[in-house]
Amino acid sequence: MSPADAFTSGSRTITPPSRPAPSDQPAWNTQKNSSMPTFRYRPFAEEVEPITLPDRTWPDKIIDRTPQWCAVDLRDGNQALIDPMSPARKRRMFDLLVRMGYKQIEVGFPSASQTDFDFVREIIEDGAIPDDVTIQVLTQCRPELIERTFVACEGARSVIVHFYNSTSILQRKVVFRADRDVIKKIATDGARKVLEEAAKFPDTDWRYEYSPESYTGTELSYAKEVCDAVTAVIDPTPEKPLILNLPATVEMATPNVYADSIEWMSRNLDRRDSIVLSLHPHNDRGTGVAAAELGYQAGADRIEGCLFGNGERTGNVCLVTLGLNLFTRGVDPQIDFSNIDEIRRTVEYCNQLPVAERHPYGGDLVYTAFSGSHQDAINKGLDAMKVTADEQGSDIGDITWQVPYLPIDPKDVGRTYEAVIRVNSQSGKGGVAYIMKSDHGLNLPRRLQIEFSQAVQRITDGEGGEVSPKEMWDVFAEEYLTPIRPLERIKQSVQAAEVDGGTDTITATVKVDGVEQEISGSGNGPLASFVDALSTIGYDVSVLDYSEHALSAGDDAQAAAYVEASVTSPTGVATTVWGVGIATSITTASLRAVVSAVNRALK
């Protein structure tokens, strides 16, 4: 390979591996050893004492019931964000978790952050915590931090105080420079302190959780020793158990190793009948879900995680994936995932991070078949479902789901069949999205691609053959750009707020069914102001998603704006559609996109 053919990044160059392969490598395997510095790393069994469990039972277990969930989005998830949640975003996330059915929610680290402290006070004083929901707060074992944690929670009905300290070989050596006895004493002193502080607030039902942080890097015998010492101090009972949380703070080995450690701990911990054994897997090796499922099979009772796997580095285990994995095997997750798009939109708003298009169950592409053979199998599977339902005198939604390539009925999580089998039926000829971008400069959002593909499909179904780029543009313009009934925007004037975060006002001239009138409104930006103005003439519009981009460079460049909106008709029926606007002004383009959505919803 010549230097010009190499991929470079900084001082590194990607070159084909060429070092000799192991002598026992089969002849049919032509791979060679690379020049990467493998010598700098070592097997897990050389870093932490190996686990011996020849009579393990977890491989034969079947998951047939749901664990106790604890959502840690507001603490572990929030601390990993580039832009940590504002109070409003935290409240929106908390309310979502409550609506979905989570009964244990870690709401912050109040002793480490004034923002977290204030949020805990807010949800307590506002009465936002339902009686059957227990909040959880995290604290290190330092006395002053524990004291402030309890002050933050004063007045709450039920609270889990989650205290922790790191116990791993590496952290004992390089962070604390302390021996095992010192580290254990930190844990037991913390346990005594939480009991002492709890006595000052007798009106709250206090529960306790202890984590030997970096558990996966800790000798099992020592992890048990520390956990048993904490248990002895807390003195739990079967009626009021202690939560012992065994986190894969850093995922260090294959999931079966984690499962072995959980089964060993479950067998050997003191007073197991008074212990709730909890898991907290991270995803450093990409196997967080597998580790959680195998660890649960191995004897755990409870799992902590985040929606869509947000969290430090590669994230916490994904509660959506875990819950819907149970659902697809006939186990009720005891959580409502029936509107996966609303859940995703809320999580994306709160985290200010996108959910990957291939993320299990929630990504834009997970119910999409691009392959013709896959589409054919899905079509035949759906047809077979209809036949079976008719034979049984039932609806498809009432019979066992069996469709190739789709482990779940998209409708059960609020998706549609059209998005599955229609989205890219012409992709062999270039694809709707590719043509719209390469020929017309429009970078359509994924869900708009799905919606517009259906319009293209109607043309191909009716006329047959291939749709040319010009024909595709004509369909797009007719669908999104040219309709002016019932609503047409003529002009607008925007008065921007004088300070950041202020309120903009808009005055616009519009035609409603051809009759010109002037409207005005206010909001956080021109788009929100225009939506507010439309409400004064009977148009109920809620913007769900918005994006924009320039179509070219230069001072006179046009911009494209895309709005996904819920538009409620005069009869009270809400329709979710996309609207598109193109103009030299991005403000005008965005308002045209709203008008486009209204006209499409009400046509």
Task: Go through the PLM ranges and name each one.
Residues 17-75, 330-520, 555-558:
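A mid-to-C-terminal "edge-of-domain" accessory segment
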Residues 39-41, 69, 85-103, 120, ...:
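Alpha/beta enzyme core
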Residues 55-60, 66, 78-84, 89-94, ...:
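Non-catalytic terminal/interface segments that mediate subunit docking, oligomerization
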Residues 76, 80, 110-114, 168-170, ...:
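Short, small-residue-enriched loops and turns at beta-alpha junctions
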Residues 132, 171-172, 246-248, 276, ...:
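Short beta-alpha connecting loops at secondary-structure transitions
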Residues 250-388:
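Catalytic alpha/beta core domains of metabolic enzymes, predominantly
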Residues 559, 584, 595-602:
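Conserved structured catalytic cores and adjacent interaction surfaces
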